[in-house]
Every structure is written in C-alpha cells, then in structure tokens.
From Swiss-Prot:
Residues 6-445 form the Hexokinase domain. The keyword Lipid biosynthesis does not apply. Residues 196-434 are annotated as: Hexokinase large subdomain. This is Hexokinase. GO terms for cellular component: cytosol; mitochondrion. Gene3D superfamilies: 3.30.420.40, 3.40.367.20. InterPro entries: ATPase_NBD, Hexokinase, Hexokinase_BS, Hexokinase_C, Hexokinase_N. PANTHER family: HEXOKINASE (PTHR19443), HEXOKINASE TYPE 1-RELATED (PTHR19443:SF16). It comes from the Eukaryota. Catalyzes the phosphorylation of various hexoses to hexose 6-phosphate. One of its GO terms (biological process) is glycolytic process. Its EC number is 2.7.1.1. It comes from Schistosoma mansoni.
C-alpha cells in the first residue's frame, strides 16, 4: 500500500504523540520533583530520593565587592578550561584570560591519576604561557559531576556522568586528587573551593544581580543549584549561617520510577544503549548530550517502518551519537516553508543519499517534538524550585549551549515556568555566561568571608 505524504506525516504525529505532554502532565512532574527534593534534604529519607540535594557548603554568595586575582578550573564535559580571573569590585566587570583544552578520550576513560595529571599539566602550561608561574594563587575548581561535599575542599565523587569513566576517582575527594598533582609540579596554587557548575552559575549571576537565587545549566548535561534555608537541610550538621546553596543533581530525577509513565519507547531504547543505563533519566530527556541521539533512535524506527528514506537506513545513522544535538538547533532555525538546514543536515552531515521533501518535514517535526519536551521539562523543574523557595522576586542565572544557542528553548522553557510557578512570584531568566569560570573564582574570593 502506498501512502501519500500527508498520510505519512500523520502516522509520524501519532507515533510521536507520547512526546506531546499536557500542562497537567508537567504539573504532576513538577509535584513529583518537589517531593523528591523534600525527601532528598532529609537524612532519614535521602536514600528514597533520586534527587540527592547535596549541600555545597557555600553559605555566602558573592556580592560584587570581591577583589583580587584568582584561578579557576572548569571540568564538566569534553572541553576543559583554565582561567585567570581578576575581580575589581563593585561596578567593574572581571578581567578574564582563559584557554580551552580538549580532554582526550583515553583520559576520560583511563585512570583517575592520568586525568588529574593532565589537568595539572595544562594548568602549568597556562601559567607558563601567561607569565604567572611564580605567582601564588587561590583556585576555585568547578567540577560538574555528582559529589557529596563535607566542606568547600572536600568533594567526593559519587559517580561519573557525561561520558567519563576514569577509574580511581569515584568515592575519592577530587580536591585532594587535584592538589596532589599540583603539588607534584611545585605549583604555588591552592584549591580553596570545589563547586558545581550550577553553583558557579548562581555565584556569577549574583555578582551582578542580588536577586539571583537559582543557577541552572542546560548544556551537555543539566543541573540546578539554589539558595535554601539552612534549617531545612538535615544533611549538613552544625550550620551557623541562615542559608546554604544546594546542588540538587536533578539530572538523576526519574531513577526511582518518577518519570516512567512519561518515558517513551525511544527514551527507553536510547537509555539501554547509553553508557549508564537506568541513570540520569531526567537529564537524558532534557540535556544536549542526549537529544540528538534520541532523535536518531526515532529516525531509525521510522526507517524500519518504511516511513523515512524509503526504508533505507544510511550507514552514518547506524552509528551511535552520529546525530549531534547542534544539528537540532540548526534544524529549528529553518522557516516552516523552507527546510534548507534540515536538508543539509541529512544530505551533507548524515550522508542520506536521497532526501524527499516529506523526509525533511518529518525529521524537522521529530527534532521539534524532542526539544519542545526538553524545554518544557526544564521549565517544570524551575517552577518546582520557585515553589520551594517561595520568594516574591527571583532571578535565575542560566548557562549552557542548549539554552544559549537553540532559537526556541528559552521561550518554551519560560512559557512552562509561567504556567506552573507560584502566582505571587516574579521571575527573570538571565544569561549567566562563564559561571563555571567567573563564578568559581568569585567563590574562591569569598571563601575567607565564610571561613
């Protein structure tokens, strides 16, 4: 039986209907996340929660008065940065020198010693090239992986995410592993704070906006940090300060089954093929590391159903992670009547030999549905945080490639926050670029205030 283009498209709409959640669905997800966060903050129920709500031990966020020269390391994905940040006080933007290094695959999956040796070597290289090797520095280390913190310089890695699997690091204090390698090279550098990139994003935004109480990352991964009332944090003993920044690690939401009724067949098949099946399920529905792969799984299925590409799957699309999330950003820049980016992606990037107009339309729709759900899920998460802190006015500092570069992600996320937030709360999403660099340096600068 031969189907018309419109019939094929209608079949795709039906197949992808599970991605099209209602506001009631997102309300329920928001409620479930709130309950997971409540459980995560209590000692007696933390094990029952998929969201671990780690105290960051940052009890004073920067206020813009900090001054001095500090170093920051930013490790949170395949690209790793070394920064020199000069803070010049109120009203002045920090001066930043930085260099980006690509972490070799063998360092990501080899030994932890080799990974931290590489980090120390690149830091030494940076200092040498900038004439700073003989100077003394305090350093803020942005380490964007799930950690249990017992202090600003005691962060134990719970588990690797985002493609890392270096052994000998899980269960160990990453500040100590870093400091050991720095000391071996006789660098006059002291790691004074380990922070998550979301904590850094919050701190960076707080330098310029005192209403900032939330830091959000939507990039390779996703996570959020926020300022919590210390009296509600049982996980942290003997807190004297009234507030503490919580690193939620919300990417793990769903690991206790909270998202099962909304996970599609494609979410499940992608998860099974992933490096850590059953883990980081919310992150796998929201973040840039997974959305392209999710679309690839959809395309493979549609080819198997003889809906796409005349049933012929190109070799390139048989390869895991061959469909990059940045392609999704390009695709949604296309006007609805002229899908030239979509066509280019399929023909030039993915080597599909024959692409019909209906193929472009279907692939564009799949990309749109996947990213739309991701943005709405992120929005439901932010609404959950706003409900929790219940302030009249809140700035959310946001960073991450998906948020920054996708043409519709911010708009969609904002739309869902608006629908689910407390009625008496006004919020503002503010781009907080370089939070993991500038923010980590600012926290290093403010450490003396809280010690």
């Amino acid at each position: 039986m031969v189907f018309s283009d419109q019939q094929l498209f209608e079949k795709v709409v039906e197949i992808l209907k599970p991605f099209d959640l209602s506001v009631v669905d997102y309300e329920e997800i928001c409620d479930r996340m709130g309950e997971s966060m409540r459980l995560g903050l209590q000692k007696s129920t933390n094990e029952k929660s998929s969201i671990k709500m780690f105290p960051s031990y940052v009890t004073k966020t920067p206020n813009g008065t900090e001054t001095g020269n500090f170093l920051a390391l930013d490790l949170g994905g395949t690209n790793y940065r070394v920064l020199s940040v000069t803070l010049e006080g109120k009203g002045k933007s920090p001066r930043i020198q930085e260099r980006t290094y690509c972490i070799p695959a063998e360092k990501m999956s080899g030994s932890g010693t080799e990974l931290f040796k590489y980090i120390a070597e690149t830091l030494a290289d940076f200092l040498e090239n900038n004439g700073m090797k003989d100077k003394k520095f305090d350093l803020g280390f942005t380490f964007s992986f799930p950690c249990v913190q017992k202090g600003l310089t005691h962060a134990t890695l719970v588990r690797w995410t985002k493609g890392f699997s270096a052994d000998g690091v899980e269960g160990h204090n990453v500040a100590e592993l870093l400091q050991t390698e720095l000391d071996k090279r006789e660098l006059n550098v002291k790691c004074v704070a380990v922070v998550n990139d979301t904590v850094g994003t919050l701190a960076s935004c707080a330098l310029e906006d005192p209403k900032c109480a939330v830091g959000l990352i939507v990039g390779t991964g996703t996570n959020v940090a926020y300022i919590e009332d210390s009296s509600k944090v049982e996980l942290m003993d003997g807190v004297k300060e009234p507030e503490v920044v919580i690193n939620t690690e919300w990417g793990a939401f769903g690991e206790k089954g909270e998202l099962d009724c909304w996970r599609t067949q494609f979410d499940k098949s992608m998860d099974i093929d992933s490096l850590h099946p059953g883990k980081q399920l919310y992150e796998k529905m929201v973040s840039g590391m997974y959305l392209g792969e999710l679309v690839r799984h959809i395309i493979v299925y549609l080819v198997e159903q003889k809906i796409l590409f005349r049933g012929d799957l190109p070799e390139r699309l048989k390869v895991r992670n061959s469909l990059l999330t940045r392609y999704l950003t390009d695709v949604e820049r296309d006007p609805a009547h002229l899908l030239y980016n979509t066509h280019y992606m399929l023909t030039d990037d993915l080597h599909v030999p024959v692409v019909e107009p209906i193929d472009n339309r279907i692939v564009r729709y799949a990309c749109e549905m996947v990213v739309k759900r991701a943005a709405y899920l992120a929005g439901a998460g932010i609404a959950c945080i706003l409900r929790r802190i219940n302030r009249s006015e809140v700035t959310v500092g946001v960073d991450g490639s998906l948020y920054k570069f996708h043409p519709k992600f911010c708009e969609r996320m904002t739309d869902m926050v608006d629908k689910l937030k407390p009625k008496n709360t006004r919020f503002c999403l503010r781009l907080s670029e370089d939070g993991s660099g500038k923010g980590a340096a600012a926290i290093a600068a403010s450490c003396t205030r809280q010690n």
